[in-house]
C-alpha cells in the first residue's frame, strides 16, 4: 500500500501542473492571435503630404503605437520631409541632427516613447500646417 500511496502523490502533483501549463499555453496562444499588428498610415490620406491638409488636424484623434508606420507620399520636386526636434518644429527650421527625406514616398517606423516632430524645409508650407507632432505609445 505504501507504494500505491507514492504513485498517487506523484499523480496528484503532476496532473494539476499539466492542467495549469495547458491553460497557460492556451492563454498565451490566444494573446498572440489577438495581438495588435502594426498599422501603416498614409499621412494626409488621399492628398498625401501636402499643405492642403493641415497635418496636425489629420493626426488628431489617431493613436500611434510603436511599430506603426507613417508613409509620406508627396511630390518630391515640390516638397520634402524632415524630422526635427521640438524647437525646429515650433520655428519651422531644421535643427542640427534633423533627418531629411526626399524620395516622394518615405516611411518612418515609430519607436516606443519617442516624440516625433515632422515638418518641411519650406517655411511658408511649414507655417501653414505642413508639420505634425506625435508620440508613439507602447504597443498593445
UniProtKB/Swiss-Prot annotation:
Matches recorded under Pfam families: Cu_bind_like
UniProt lineage: Eukaryota, Viridiplantae, Streptophyta, Embryophyta, Tracheophyta
The keyword Glycoprotein appears for this protein: yes
Family: Belongs to the early nodulin-like (ENODL) family.
GO molecular function annotations of the record: electron transfer activity
Membrane is among the record's keywords: no
Known function: May act as a carbohydrate transporter.
Carbohydrate attachment residues: 85
Record protein name field: Early nodulin-like protein 22
SS bond partners: 92-126
CDD domains named in the record: Plantacyanin
Keywords of the record: Disulfide bond, Glycoprotein, Signal
UniProt-listed InterPro entries: Cupredoxin, Phytocyanin-like, Phytocyanin_dom, Plantacyanin
Gene of this entry: ENODL22
Originating organism: Arabidopsis thaliana
Phytocyanin domain mapped to chain residues: 39-138
Amino acid at each position: 500500500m505504501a507504494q500505491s500511496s507514492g504513485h498517487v502523490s506523484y499523480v496528484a502533483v503532476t496532473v494539476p501542473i499539466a492542467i495549469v501549463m495547458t491553460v497557460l499555453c492556451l492563454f498565451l496562444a490566444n494573446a498572440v492571435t489577438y495581438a495588435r499588428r502594426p498599422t501603416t498610415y498614409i499621412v494626409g490620406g488621399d492628398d498625401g503630404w501636402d499643405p492642403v491638409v493641415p497635418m496636425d488636424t489629420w493626426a488628431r484623434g489617431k493613436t500611434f503605437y510603436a511599430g506603426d508606420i507613417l508613409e509620406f507620399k508627396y511630390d518630391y520636386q515640390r516638397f520634402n520631409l524632415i524630422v526635427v526636434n521640438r524647437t525646429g518644429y515650433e520655428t519651422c527650421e531644421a535643427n542640427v541632427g534633423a533627418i531629411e527625406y526626399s524620395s516622394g514616398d518615405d516611411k518612418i517606423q515609430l519607436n516606443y516613447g519617442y516624440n516625433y516632430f515632422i515638418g518641411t524645409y519650406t517655411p511658408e508650407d511649414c507655417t501653414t500646417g505642413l508639420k505634425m507632432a506625435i508620440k508613439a505609445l507602447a504597443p498593445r
